Amino acid sequence: MAEENIIFVGKKPTMNYVLAVVTQFNNNANKIIIKARGKTISKAVDVAEITRHKFIPDAKYEEIRLDTETLQGERGSSNVSSIEITLSR
């Protein structure tokens, strides 16, 4: 899968990410991966649901992967949850 078919969800408004997903599907991508960590996990789920219900009804969940990543910081290591949602058409 090409790197351009991966959408990293962050601090921007939800609809920006929805637009990115819809644009990728309109550019003939068959699979899109939506990735998020920590507090943005709920936003990633919103992006997937808005995409499926309002813009691309024939999109299906192919895979949902949950994980815990260990990040090193100034105060030692911390565990951060992450999600990868794969949508296909």
From Swiss-Prot:
Task: Specify the domain of life of the species encoding this protein.
Answer: Archaea
Q: Which residues carry this modification: N6-acetyllysine?
A: 11
GO CC field: chromosome; cytoplasm
Biological process annotations from GO:
chromosome condensation
Q: Which residues form the signal peptide?
A: none
Q: Name one Pfam family in it.
A: Alba
State where the protein is found.
Cytoplasm; Chromosome
Keyword Cytoplasm assigned to the entry: answer is: yes
Entry-linked InterPro entries: Alba-like_dom_sf, DNA/RNA-bd_Alba, DNA/RNA-bd_Alba-like
**Single GO molecular-function term?**
double-stranded DNA binding
Q: How is it modified after translation?
A: Acetylated. Acetylation at Lys-11 decreases DNA-binding affinity.
Q: Which UniProt keywords apply?
A: Acetylation, Chromosome, Cytoplasm, DNA condensation, DNA-binding
Question: Where do the TM regions start and end?
Answer: none
Please give the function described in this protein's UniProt entry. Answer: Binds double-stranded DNA tightly but without sequence specificity. Involved in DNA compaction.
Q: Which family does it belong to?
A: Belongs to the histone-like Alba family.
The protein here is known as: DNA/RNA-binding protein Alba
Q: To which species is this protein native?
A: Thermoplasma volcanium (strain ATCC 51530 / DSM 4299 / JCM 9571 / NBRC 15438 / GSS1)
